[in-house]
UniProtKB/Swiss-Prot annotation:
TPR repeats lie at residues 315-348, 505-538, 546-579. It comes from the Eukaryota. It comes from Homo sapiens. This is Tetratricopeptide repeat protein 39A. Keywords: Repeat, TPR repeat. One of its GO terms (cellular component) is centrosome. Belongs to the TTC39 family.
Length: 613
């Protein structure tokens, strides 16, 4: 690594490392611009000639392939992206200083300074950390279970849709179970090494000895991206997981993570748009699905606006524009955005699939079951992420139809529900929580005379926090409440069976949510409390109890009854284990607890200020 002759051989036409680094960054910015204007193959073709010599070309090329793999979950895409990212990492290693930033991590005396690194070497460090992190993500994906052999195909085929054949072959693991555990451990090691590198680089940037080189905005942008991503992600984890990670050296600060990403997003670097996309994911997905539904939508719109102006037909930004409209409760506007996103490009079908998923939920919010079914059906035929979930949703929507509506589709919901368990896949040896939930709910259909689920589509809507969407529009909430009330009346009139209490409690949970958003607070509280009162009678849907406590706590928080809310949240966290969607519930409990404690602290400060005055 330290031999000058070897380094110079990496640069054609006698270029210096510094000039070649600047040129590489300019070219990668051009490729990124092509990508953001939906010219996906052109971006890859532009980058490919220098992927064997330039670490930035190699990393950017591999990143685009990884984005494709993340969207398709296809083993071919995962394998291809993994191999390319490994090559990028090896290339970064060739450019790194022999004594890297983490080599002396354990020594407080001999810790490195930036003066010991050339500009190229310090860029190699941040690119190396990025490769490690992205390879870790792919390692976790390599436990995906898909049918069919992995067939070689061209590197430049982003139009590839799901090639997984129908039938039980999808049950076979892409890797064996024990290999999945090895993959998981390897992925964890990569994450830790990446974390330590970013941590050291952040310390170097903050040091007084930091001297900025010609391409320092790109280097700093890379550090801010990594440090911000780690801090933000770690800060969201449930307390019990975070304590374990802190024991092995990890720590996360949400405010610092957001600050780093916001600074990275506001700069003019190669990674600025990556910081923007990560922040948009955080604001429009993570805090919404894994949080309380309180989203900083103004910040999301502020981040998106300049990119939507610059790339008005950019599929990525149109998609986020649709997500923002969903969260605001503007469902018709969201539908137009997602349809526009699909029309904007035809090359990467994976973007279409993301839009189909969102459109499925948009029509669910409107109670238009035929359109919801249509998009679930499209996903089940074209996308490999979770066949079990898609088929379950098809069955769920069919069960919401009137009997006269079934025939045109030629599907039978009972047969579809029965097919769900055979479509399960695994990632890193673990089943997807949504699939496990769908499989558990489908089990009742295996009896000779199955008892139907009362409102399966509206139950899954709760799992994805959809009531926080319809709650923005009283008309939508009224429509869903009417459906739930009819289901409640049918349960009351019907004969008692082994699922009666479970179904009644489910309906009360969903009814309570609608009543809450309609401002009928007392009625909502009564519905939530009735679930806890029937705790001992619930046989199967044990997830209802901690979630009822969570929803009751959120209701109390809106009334500034934060101390009561915290007690309920603590009970939900400590007293219930091994239920469906437990991790997602714990994420939401963590977010609610932090919000309640923050409100209490603000109230205390206000009281102290008023007393001092």
């Amino acid at each position: 690594m330290g031999q000058k002759g070897h380094k110079d051989s990496l640069y054609p036409c006698g270029g210096t490392p510094e000039s070649s680094l600047h040129e590489a960054l300019d070219q990668c910015m051009t490729a990124l611009d092509l990508f953001l204007t939906n010219q996906f193959s052109e971006a890859l073709s532009y980058l490919k000639p220098r992927t064997k010599e330039s670490m930035y070309h190699s990393l950017t090329y591999a990143t685009i392939l990884e984005m494709q793999a993340m969207m398709t979950f296809d083993p071919q895409d995962i394998l291809l992206a993994g191999n390319m990212m490994k090559e990028a990492q090896m290339l970064c290693q060739r450019h790194r200083r022999k004594s890297s930033v983490t080599d002396s991590f354990s020594s407080l005396v001999n810790r490195p300074t930036l003066g010991q690194f050339t500009e190229e070497e310090i860029h190699a460090e941040v690119c190396y950390a990025e490769c490690l992190l992205q390879r870790a993500a792919l390692t976790f994906l390599q436990g995906s279970s898909h049918g069919g052999a992995v067939r070689p195909r061209a590197l430049h085929d982003p139009s590839h849709a799901c090639s997984c054949p129908p039938g039980p072959g999808r049950q076979h693991l892409f890797l064996l179970q024990d290999e999945n555990m090895v993959s998981f451990i390897k992925g964890g090691i990569k994450v830790r090494n990446s974390y330590q590198t970013y941590k050291e680089l952040d310390s170097l940037v903050q040091s007084s000895q930091y001297c900025k080189g010609e391409n320092h905005p790109h280097f700093e942008g890379g550090v801010k991206l990594g440090v911000g991503a780690f801090n933000l992600t770690l800060s969201m984890l449930p307390t019990r997981i975070l304590r374990l990670l802190e024991f092995v050296g990890f720590s996360g600060n949400k405010d610092y993570g957001l600050l780093q990403l916001e600074e990275g997003a506001s700069g003019h670097s190669f990674r600025s748009v990556l910081c923007v996309m990560l922040l948009l994911c955080y604001h429009t997905f993570l805090t919404f699905v894994l949080g309380t539904g309180n989203v900083n939508i103004e910040e999301a719109e502020k981040l998106l606006k300049p990119y939507l102006n610059r790339y008005p037909k950019g599929a990525i930004f149109l998609f986020f524009a649709g997500r923002i409209e969903v969260i605001k409760g503007n469902i018709d506007a969201a539908i137009r955005r997602f349809e526009e996103c699909c029309e904007a490009q035809q090359h990467w079908k994976q973007f279409h699939h993301m839009c189909y998923w969102e459109l499925m939920w948009c029509f669910t919010y409107k109670g238009q079951w035929k359109m919801s079914y249509f998009y679930a059906d499209l996903l089940s035929k074209e996308n490999c992420w979770s066949k079990a979930t898609y088929i379950y949703m098809k069955a769920a929507y069919l069960s919401m139809f009137g009997k006269e509506d079934h025939k045109p589709f030629g599907d039978d919901e009972v047969e579809l529900f029965r097919a769900v368990p055979g479509l399960k896949l695994k990632i890193a040896g673990k089943s997807l929580p949504t699939e496990k939930f769908a499989i558990r709910k489908s089990r009742r259909y295996f009896s000779s005379n199955p008892i139907s689920l009362p409102v399966p589509a509206l139950e899954m809507m709760y799992i994805w926090n959809g009531y926080a969407v319809i709650g923005k529009q009283p008309k939508l909430t009224d429509g869903i409440l009417e459906i739930i009330t009819k289901a409640e009346e049918m349960l009351e009139k019907g004969p008692e069976n082994e699922y009666s209490v479970d179904d009644e409690c489910l309906v009360k949970l969903l009814k309570g949510l609608c009543l809450k958003y309609l401002g009928r607070v007392q009625e909502a509280e009564e519905n939530f409390r009735s679930i806890s009162a029937n705790e001992k009678k619930i046989k199967y849907d044990h997830y209802l109890i901690p979630n009822a406590l969570l929803e009751l706590a959120l209701l109390l928080m809106e009334q500034d009854r934060n101390e009561e809310a915290i007690k309920l949240l603590e009970s939900a966290k400590q007293n219930y284990k091994n239920y469906s969607m437990e991790s997602r519930t714990h994420f939401r409990i963590q977010a609610a607890t932090l919000q309640a404690k923050s409100s209490l602290e603000n109230s205390s400060r206000s009281m102290v200020s008023s007393v001092s005055l």
